[in-house]
Design a protein with these regions (language model features):
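Alpha/beta-hydrolase fold nucleophile elbow
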Residues: 124-135, 156
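Non-catalytic cap/lid and distal C-terminal segments of serine-dependent acyl enzymes
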Residues: 106-107, 140
Length: 293
């Protein structure tokens, strides 16, 4: 995390600059690679948006953008599986801040804009709305969910929600289980870039949640794996399977060994009645899903 040159004055100087305004990019079948603006003439929804279809809203994180490979893979996997609307929240110009604290400040504004879009979708007939946020984007999703109350987004998925700057944040500023009807969270780099504490109705700690097999260098590999695993989960025939564990300490001391009797499916097709902690084992390379516990 870089805070060099952080200046609180910039918190207000950039936030409402039209050049830095978040953009909403729509993808639909049949041409899944054609980018479309979600809005025609700034206010009317794109005619290619089909409101009675499932709508997936994907939010990237700090120093990232909608071209991040696992997020693109996610979009492609959804559109391969079914007719749906995939909307990317492109807040690249705000997320590109060298000062991480500035990027955190911007999550509130981006969350407000996402909430406005979801309200527009809901008011015009959309019902099946699923917001997927990676890293800092997970908290953007949570802020949007908080602002939309008493309405609740049907589902929010948090992919390794960012830890730095959020340990003492209030629930209005971060993702938590009250932000949607169902919140599922996937931890892959806790105590480093990702939060260790539970943030959803069900939290999956992939390979224990700290480091990931096959990630040997100090980079974003462990953190990004959350998005990689989730993208694969959309269409995998093998599935990512988790077993319950009361907490990470008990997993560390081998007090909750794998059990097939209580295992559940993790990922996009998760059982929405699932609650609490689960541990998921993966392979070290693609395909990552494994039947082994």
């Amino acid at each position: 995390m870089h805070n060099d040159g952080c200046d609180k004055k910039l918190r207000h100087a950039i936030k409402h600059d039209t050049e830095h305004e978040p953009k909403f990019v729509l993808f639909t079948r049949p041409d899944v690679n054609t980018t479309q603006d979600l809005f025609d003439n700034d206010t009317e929804l794109n005619v290619n948006l089909t409101l009675n279809l499932p709508t997936k809203i994907i939010v990237h994180g700090w120093k990232s953008d909608i071209r991040l490979t696992p997020l693109v893979d996610m979009k492609n996997e959804y559109l391969l599986r079914e007719e749906c609307n995939v909307i990317f929240v492109d807040w690249e110009k705000l997320a590109a801040e060298e000062c991480y604290l500035h990027a955190i400040w911007h999550t509130t504004y981006v969350g407000q804009r996402v909430a406005e879009v979801i309200r527009k979708l809901r008011d015009t007939g959309a019902e099946d709305i699923h917001v997927i946020g990676f890293s800092l984007g997970a908290h953007v999703a949570g802020i949007a969910g908080f602002l939309l109350r008493p309405y609740k987004i049907p589902r929010i998925t948090g992919l390794d929600p960012a830890m730095p700057g959020f340990i003492f944040a209030s629930n209005s500023e971060k993702l938590d289980s009250t932000d949607a009807e169902f919140v599922d969270v996937y931890h892959t780099n806790v105590l480093m870039q990702g939060k260790i504490e539970r943030s959803g109705h069900v939290d999956f700690y992939m390979n224990g949640g700290v480091t990931q097999p096959g990630c040997h260098e100090r980079s974003n590999c462990d953190h990004t794996r959350s998005a990689v695993y989730f993208a694969e989960s959309i269409n995998t025939e093998v599935g990512f399977w988790g077993w319950p564990c009361p907490n990470l300490w008990e997993f560390t001391i081998h007090a909750c060994p794998p059990t097939t009797r209580l295992r559940i499916l993790a990922g996009d097709n998760v059982d929405k009645s699932a609650r609490n902690y689960y541990i998921v084992k993966t392979n070290a390379e693609s395909p990552f899903a494994t039947r082994d516990l």
